[in-house]
Amino acid sequence: MKYEAKAWKETEGACLRNFKEQAQIDSVNGALALRPQIEKIIDQIWEEGFDGIYFIGIGGTYASSMQVEVYMRGRSKLPVFVENAAEFLTTGNKKFTNKSVVIISSVSGNTKEMVELVDRVHEKGAKVFSFIDNPGTILTQPDKQDYLIVYPMNEQLKFYMVANYLMYKNGEFDDYDRYNKEMEANLADVLVQVEKDSDEWAYEYAKNKVAFWKEHKDLPHYFIGSGNQYGATYSYAMCYWEEQMWIRTKSISCQEFFHGMQEIIVEDTPVTLFMGEDEQRPL
């Protein structure tokens, strides 16, 4: 029998299409429940000593790495760095030693640059702490990681849990226990409610953007963000609009907007601004 997928129709409007509330709640709570495993691994890393923590990624995982690095930059004295995997493979980093620790994430577990990266890191005698979504993949193999957690999705949350415990260990997060108690009690339900509350707005946003794009297919859409939202800005433009929908985009940081981009923004130029709540919001 021929399979015929039922296509969503615009006339259906905002309808939380493909939204599975309980699955979403379970996914976030499952990630939060990884905290004891994360703390145990960080305790071991801390005991062994390190001269640098390197969040390294490619594409979307690089975006998440940028987010966690800027989050820690203004809060911690720990030596924390962010690197693009492909750049690290070609350029390296003279500060990187056999006492460095690399933290990575991968959905597929097979990404070419990340596989090459962990091999290079191990050649230098350094350690790799990996978050991998899919079991049985290349990056889960014993020779590709030193510390491993396999759990799907919630990449930024997992990175932030690492960051928070590192800062707690360094005496920089006094409210760590209270913070986690509140997160574990509320985060999953709050995130689900955000999806519900924003669905109507998201539908109108998407509908208007598609209508504009159909009339201006050669005009790129500009995305602007800063602070811990810049990684999301970069990822949303590249991974979602370009990679998945083949729509031309450009992402730029708020701090750079007035040094070039403002000169080409006119009345009908499509621009989306990501507004965060961290130290860089004034930008």
Question: What are these language model-derived features?
Answer:
Residues 68-74, 119-120, 236-244, 266-267:
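Short, solvent-exposed amphipathic alpha-helical segments in soluble enzyme
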Residues 230-233, 259-261, 281-282:
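Short acidic/glycine-rich loop or secondary-structure boundary segments that cap or lie
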Residues 12-52, 146-148, 154-155, 164-252:
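Active-site phosphate/pyrophosphate-binding segments
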Residues 1, 263-266, 270-275:
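Long, low-complexity, Lys/Arg-enriched
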Residues 79-91, 250-263:
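A short, well-structured beta->alpha microelement
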Residues 93, 233-236, 261-264:
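Short, well-ordered secondary-structure micro-motifs
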Residues 46, 51-189, 226, 274-283:
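Glycine-rich phosphate-binding loops that contact phosphosugars or nucleotide phosphates
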